[in-house]
């Protein structure tokens, strides 16, 4: 049950408060001052310029949700190594959501002394993107010696995680 992970942007709340339908609606209203009772689909249409409203605020609302989602996925990935499938109605807005998700997954943390460290031990690739998918599938292998022998084997040191939407 990942909903109990913390919301990166508002740590007193669970992650569900930052990535749900109500989160998109609340964040758009806060950013735009728009008091209409809009659905995430309508907020997406505003972001696209197909509906009256504040497109920048609409895109930012999805970006904020993507940041929270990316942090939640990165936290889960620290424990569970696997492919990530993101579904649900909100994923229809993936063009505004996924850039922030990927920024979080491939972002950095800072150590107390100021040294940056990768957020995850692996590189995340957005498999819906042809370029990322090709990079994900391209090995970066080299030959290494098997300890205690003279044998060599092919080894790919790059840890990878694929992220795909449904």
Where are these predicted regions, by residue range?
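A conserved active-site-flanking secondary-structure segment within enzyme catalytic domains
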Residues: 1-2
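ATP-binding/phosphotransfer module of carbohydrate and carboxylate kinases, centering on a glycine-rich
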Residues: 6-166
